[in-house]
Amino acid sequence: MSLTPHGGVLINRVNEEYDLSTVAKEIELDAISFADLELIAIGGYSPIEGFLTKADYEAVVSSMRLASGVVWSLPITLPVTKEKAAEIHQGDIVRLSYNGTVYGVIEVEDQYTPDKEKEAVNVYKTDDRNHPGVKKLFERGDTYIGGKITLTKRSEKPFPQFTYEPEETRRHFKENGWKTIVGFQTRNPVHRAHEYIQKTALETVDGLFLNPLVGETKSDDIPADVRMKSYQVLLNGYYPKDRVFLGVFPAAMRYAGPKEAIFHALVRKNYGCTHFIVGRDHAGVGDYYGTYEAQELFEQFTSEEIGITPLKFEHSFYCNTCEAMATPKTCPHDKSEHVILSGTKVRTMLRNGELPPSTFSRKEVIETLIEGLKTTVS
């Protein structure tokens, strides 16, 4: 399979020589839009070249496609307050700043008032304000600004040694001779169930791209710096160094379940992956989505439309009788013999000061997490 970016071309909207002297108006971004700005500019969100215009937004919300017909499952928008929107007009070029520093500009093509109730139900499958993605949606501005962006300044990265743009990951894969690469998305520490499906996938491809999300997440998720230490410990001790590549994904978590799974796959395609692991309740939260709903959503599109192969894994567990990791496909034993692993369960145990058993996670990983969380709390 070729490593063609989504839409056919890897977008590059970076111009650090851009003359800002004549640009007066300014929009202050939140953490989500700031991460999106950079990811649009470096091609992570190809074929998108800016924050969605009304036509693209409505097409994505209603049909999971851009107005051009290209598959795209999540609306990437720039929300502003009504007061800020009143200052901005079609044709304006507006600075985009974060924490007082200008990082880019947007060429305003339009501004529009979204139907947030419809967006919530169509994207998140609920309008329940207790859902973290829905809550965030309604907290943000009520007017959306659409238009192409230019990144005029790259930000300082929290994990510079693990930060790669799509052009760089593609080059790395090529230099290593990898023709097939499987991407793995996570916002959790890697537990034994993750390790099992990653290594099972690695048996069939040339390389694994471990691409943990380090943008904005829920307050009860394990902090990114603690997770990054745990990934390094795990990879150094239990994975072949020449078959795995660790790089961060700086986007915010949307918790949009099935539609975010499609989005995660398309983005990893842009980073150069040919395959993408889709496990149980991918990008889910609480009980809002079915266990395998994300996997089923991929069936709505042809392989040509998606352009990346989903590797669908059933719920894996540790079987006391098998004395090994397994899934319902490979283990005949009763559920009473199964130790169910999940990131939520590991997080809860760690927060409560409990030591998860070795069937949950590698000893070195647990030690790293406990030490990291102590530092975070203190």
Swiss-Prot record:
Pfam families attached to this UniProt entry: ATP-sulfurylase, PUA_2
Alphabetical list of Gene3D superfamilies matching this protein: HUPs, Sulfate adenylyltransferase
This protein's pathway: Sulfur metabolism; hydrogen sulfide biosynthesis; sulfite from sulfate: step 1/3
Keyword Transferase: yes
GO biological process: hydrogen sulfide biosynthetic process; sulfate assimilation
InterPro entries: ATP-Sase_PUA-like_dom (IPR025980), PUA-like_sf (IPR015947), Rossmann-like_a/b/a_fold (IPR014729), SO4_adenylyltransferase_pro (IPR020792), Sulfurylase_cat_dom (IPR024951), Sulphate_adenylyltransferase (IPR002650)
Top-rank lineage group of the source organism: Bacteria
Keywords: ATP-binding, Nucleotide-binding, Nucleotidyltransferase, Transferase
Enzyme nomenclature, EC number: 2.7.7.4
Single Gene Ontology MF annotation: sulfate adenylyltransferase (ATP) activity
Catalytic activity: sulfate + ATP + H(+) = adenosine 5'-phosphosulfate + diphosphate
NCBIfam families: PRK04149.1, sopT
UniProt similarity note: Belongs to the sulfate adenylyltransferase family.
HAMAP family on file: Sulf_adenylyltr
Name listed for the protein in its UniProt record: Sulfate adenylyltransferase
Biological source species: Bacillus pumilus (strain SAFR-032)
Lineage: Bacteria, Bacillati, Bacillota, Bacilli, Bacillales
Gene: sat
